[in-house]
Amino acid sequence: DCLLSRGLGDVYKRQPTFTLNGRLIIVMWMSGHPGNRRQWKAEMMTAATHLACVARSQSMGNGIPGLQKRKKRIMKMVLFYTLHTTKRRRNMKKQGFGTTKDGKEALLYTLSNKNGMEISVTDYGAHLVSVLVPDKDGKKRDVVLGFDSVTGYETDGSHFGATIGRNGNRIAGAAFELHGKTYQLAKNENNNNLHSGPDGYDYRLWNVEEADDSAVTFVLMSPDGDQGFPGNFEVSVTYTLTDENAVEIHYEGSCDQDTVVNMTNHSYFNLAGHDAGSIENQTLVLKAEQFSPVIDSASIPIGEHAPVQGTPMDFTSEKAIGAEIEADFEQLKLTGGYDHNFILDKAVEGSIELMAVASCKESGITMEAFTDLPCVQFYAGNFIAPVTGCLLYTSPSPRDKRQS
């Protein structure tokens, strides 16, 4: 039946719906994907979450056309950031964000919610550019690090707010083996590959598939052999700002071959504001009782898990980020501070659960981070001076010392 009869507005009146386990499902037609592949997008809309799954359109029969799962090569990851602050109509703004080195125009999309919170994202690298949050006094603070135009993102190597792909984090020796074949990647950090090399997805202009008052979806086609990875890989990333002050980041992708995929967002957070100085007095809780020790300063894990208890790596209870960062502890000395993988205490594998809580007493801003992945990399911004911010990006568990 029609969503108009459910009181959800004229804009949805052509969209078919049904209910599942007491939840309303909206079926929306998606087009414009490379290769003209037809797809249906089924979205569950609840007060606090936005969960999406994609299915290939196989038939036009009765009921929900083609609502069949794709083959095994489906990648879906979800990351939520919820910022708590101390009513306004939604709207989306689109404006120029400068011109790239090859003469293409980049665009900036700004979303706002009824609480006065705003986020800005750009089609260049699908970057999260800014997150403006009212503090305890109602003053807006930009709590992520970034630049005012596309030029900064083209020239800086810190990956502020970047959508990293095809693989986030490090691959030792810049090579991996899959099904008996060795794939060589670019060596862009010592002898290793970091964030897929110098031609990462964050240095490309993405296509905008959808943009409305609450969400923007960027899409990219990465061909077989791109960056050295096998398979034609189609990926989308959707940024959503909710009225619950949640920034939701959804990744969806498919590939025609087995490949390595580890998409992530690379935003640095300073909850006092991007220009407020040190984060050492801001506090952090990580839902992780184990971490991955590294071999050396290259931050490649040794392939084992170690307990955080009794070490400076223990953030299981609230602790200032700078409290033990200079402790006489080998792992911190190797990496110049925190730059380690933490294994999350997941109640249910693959479920969306709280992974971290960061707080700033001075601003009154608290951020909760949720993910459906098993690990989080915590980087305290050891080498991004003069600005300061901490980075939390999610990932699968490192399999051995070959991959971080």
Where are these regions (language model features)?
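Single conserved hydrophobic/aromatic residue that forms the stacking wall/gate
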Residues: 1-15, 393-404
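Short hydrophobic targeting helices and cationic amphipathic motifs
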Residues: 34-37, 51, 81
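Alpha-helix boundary/capping motif
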Residues: 31, 46-47
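An exposed, glycine/acidic-rich loop-and-rim segment of catalytic or binding clefts
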Residues: 92-395
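Intrinsic disorder/low-complexity segments enriched in small, polar and charged residues
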Residues: 19-22, 55, 60-65
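Short, Lys/Arg-enriched N-terminal segments with co-localized hydrophobic residues
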Residues: 70-74, 80-91
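Serine residues within intrinsically disordered or low-complexity segments
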Residues: 31, 57-59, 397
